[in-house]
Amino acid sequence: MSSKEQNTPNEQASDEIETEQAKNQGADTAAEAADQRDERIAQLEAQLAESQGGVRDAQLRAQAEIENIRRRAELDVEKAHKFALEKFSNELLPVIDSLERALEVADKSNPELAAMIEGIDLTMKSLLGAVRKFGVEVVGDTNVPFNPEVHQAMSMMESEEVEPNHVMMVMQRGYTLNGRLLRPAMVAVAKSKG
């Protein structure tokens, strides 16, 4: 045997140790790589879950916004239908006022005017009936509590017959359209004597 072929037992042990160490280093490197891979997988899964949560949240917000837009559109259409007659109704109020004034100043004692007065009265009643069909209501009762939302106080008068802060006299009737004020009633409000 040549000297190269002969390995001393120390050399053989040293070779085995190096081989063992190389195997251990390879195993350690493989374990580290596996750990890094597992960490990266965990990070990516966390990012995926977070982005999916964000997508779900965005989807829910979008659905809620669509529902809100739909509801607002329905309300707008409902209001448009309900109050479409507001301008037209406001234009009719002076006509009703004129008919009322004509009845107030008409000479009811003159028999020659009786037919005309009756015609004006029927015309006014017919016009009021027509506007009521479309939601126009009269505000003009007396002996009711003064309500600043539908009454405009023109004066205050002392009275023993009418309770204080109640409508004593209506100077001009007011009107509402489906609960919305078209014109306040101009009234005199009672106050206690004192």
From Swiss-Prot:
Keyword terms: Chaperone, Cytoplasm, Stress response
One function term, GO molecular function aspect: unfolded protein binding
Principal location listed in the UniProt entry: cytoplasm
Compartmental location: Cytoplasm
Region ranges (Disordered): 1-39
Function according to Swiss-Prot or TrEMBL: Participates actively in the response to hyperosmotic and heat shock by preventing the aggregation of stress-denatured proteins, in association with DnaK and GrpE. It is the nucleotide exchange factor for DnaK and may function as a thermosensor. Unfolded proteins bind initially to DnaJ; upon interaction with the DnaJ-bound protein, DnaK hydrolyzes its bound ATP, resulting in the formation of a stable complex. GrpE releases ADP from DnaK; ATP binding to DnaK triggers the release of the substrate protein, thus completing the reaction cycle.
Subunit structure: Homodimer.
Designated name of the protein: Protein GrpE
Taxonomy of the source species: Bacteria, Pseudomonadati, Pseudomonadota, Gammaproteobacteria, Enterobacterales
